[in-house]
Curated annotation (Swiss-Prot):
This is Macrolide glycosyltransferase. It comes from Streptomyces lividans. GO terms for molecular function: hexosyltransferase activity; UDP-glycosyltransferase activity. It is an enzyme of class 2 (transferase). Specifically inactivates macrolides via 2'-O-glycosylation using UDP-glucose. Its EC number is 2.4.1.-. NCBIfam families: macro_glyco_Mgt (NF033129), MGT (TIGR01426). One of its GO terms (biological process) is antibiotic biosynthetic process.
Length: 418
């Protein structure tokens, strides 16, 4: 039986038993908004269906998952938190990956103890939670990855992974990283190589629009199911009113992590503050003092944090770091984008957005006031850009929703229960 048919048959069978057999589902994530927010509506839907959902999360974001109806299982993380200085993440590949392994190793005994005698029927996990996969193997229950960003396609390792790791693997530090990872897995009875252990889940729900996935035609859809952005009611984040007389509104945001860019923000003030009829909302984060921006004209609104989706629903342009969340919100609201990627998957997202014909990409060092203004004026009045955005927006509306992911999770539960 094909996986699609299995899902449908199992879902219907499971639905008949749900009234007497609710499941315990355990979700695992790290304390970063971009890793927690994308799946919250899926959690909310599972709770609404009668499942008990526990959520392994550091205290910093425990209230957020509790609001979705999950029971927080608290643990102490060694990773930089959501308000940490971006420089805490380092600047090299090994700087970026070593903290995740160290955190996984120290969190495993905490989480094993937290779930002792309360083992779940199924494990859900963010891609950064290596511990969840180890525990899922130990408990012999289904494990499903919830990916908030692009996933590996057939050929990814040869085209991206191996070239990226070629030099770090040769170093003593790189070899020590892999030796430590291998040893930790082997201690837990796992013989997988670390790379596929992290990057090749047995089952994954991809929480981005298929339009943002590179080489989507080469993604194994027996493993990965694209369910689109699962956006729920965001009114709790606050509202925003477009100023009267504003002919164009531009939102500038580099997300929640890599926001320490005062020089870039000054270029944005120069780029858009001098445009007649334009109003700019500039989110600078917690690590930039607005005084560092110098003289700011009245048509530039400087904020530490903004209700992003509420503004995008009224904006004419989005200057973004091209994180997965921001990219799909730009597409969902049909807002042209200038992508200024800062780290990780943002460079790939920026390439995808530009390839779709709905964005221009500027490296941070090239994002001068002149370059930003030129890109902005070219994008906002281009009818072809607007038409492409409307087409993608319509496709996304068909993908989106929380019932689909919940149905698929229930299908995996039913298949495991036989």
């Amino acid at each position: 039986m094909k996986r699609k048919e299995l899902h449908e048959t199992s879902r219907l069978a499971y639905g008949r038993r749900m009234t007497t057999r609710p499941a315990h589902i355990a979700m695992f994530s790290i304390a970063l908004h971009g890793h927690v927010n994308p799946s919250l509506e899926v959690i909310r839907e599972l709770v609404a269906r009668g499942h008990r959902v526990t959520y392994a999360i550091p205290r910093l974001l425990a209230d957020k998952v509790a609001e979705a109806g999950a029971e927080p299982k608290l643990w102490n993380s060694t990773l930089p938190g959501p308000d940490a200085d971006p420089e805490a993440w380092g600047s090299t590949l090994l700087d970026n990956v070593e903290p995740f392994l160290a955190d996984a190793i120290q969190s495993l005994p905490q989480l094993a103890q937290a779930y002792e005698g309360d083992e779940p029927d199924l494990v859900l996990h963010d891609i950064a939670s290596y511990t969840a996969r180890v525990l899922g193997r130990r408990w012999e229950v289904p494990v499903i990855s919830l990916s908030p960003c692009m996933v590996a396609w057939e050929g990814y390792e040869q085209e991206v992974g191996e070239p990226m790791w070629e030099e770090p693997r040769k170093t003593e530090r790189g070899q020590a990283y892999y030796a430590r990872f291998h040893a930790w897995l082997e201690e837990n009875g796992i013989t997988d190589h670390p790379d596929p252990f992290i990057g090749r889940p047995d089952r994954s729900l991809v929480l981005i629009p298929k339009a943002l996935q590179p080489h989507a035609d080469r993604v194994d859809e027996t493993t990965y199911t694209f369910v689109g952005a699962c956006q729920g009611d965001r009114t709790a984040e606050g509202d925003w009113a477009r100023p009267e007389g504003a002919e164009k509104v531009v939102l500038v945001s580099l997300g929640s992590a890599f926001t320490k860019q005062p020089a870039f923000y000054r270029e944005c003030v120069r780029a858009f503050g001098e445009l007649p009829g334009w109003h700019t909302v500039l989110q600078v984060g917690r690590h930039v003092d607005p005084a560092e921006l110098g003289d700011v004209p009245d048509n530039v609104e400087v904020r530490t944090w903004v209700p992003q989706l509420a503004i995008l629903q009224q904006a004419d342009l989005f200057v973004t770091h091209a994180g997965a969340g921001g990219s799909q919100e730009g597409l969902a609201t049909a807002t042209p984008m200038i992508a200024v990627p800062q780290a990780a998957d943002q460079f790939g997202n920026a390439d995808m957005l530009q390839g779709l014909g709905v964005a221009r990409t500027l490296p941070t060092e090239e994002a001068t006031a002149k370059a930003l203004r030129t890109a902005a004026l070219a994008l906002v009045d281009d009818p072809e850009v607007a038409a492409r955005l409307k087409e993608i927006q319509a496709r996304m509306a068909q993908e989106a929703g929380t019932r689909g992911p919940a149905d698929l999770i229930e299908a995996e539960l039913a298949a495991a229960r036989g």
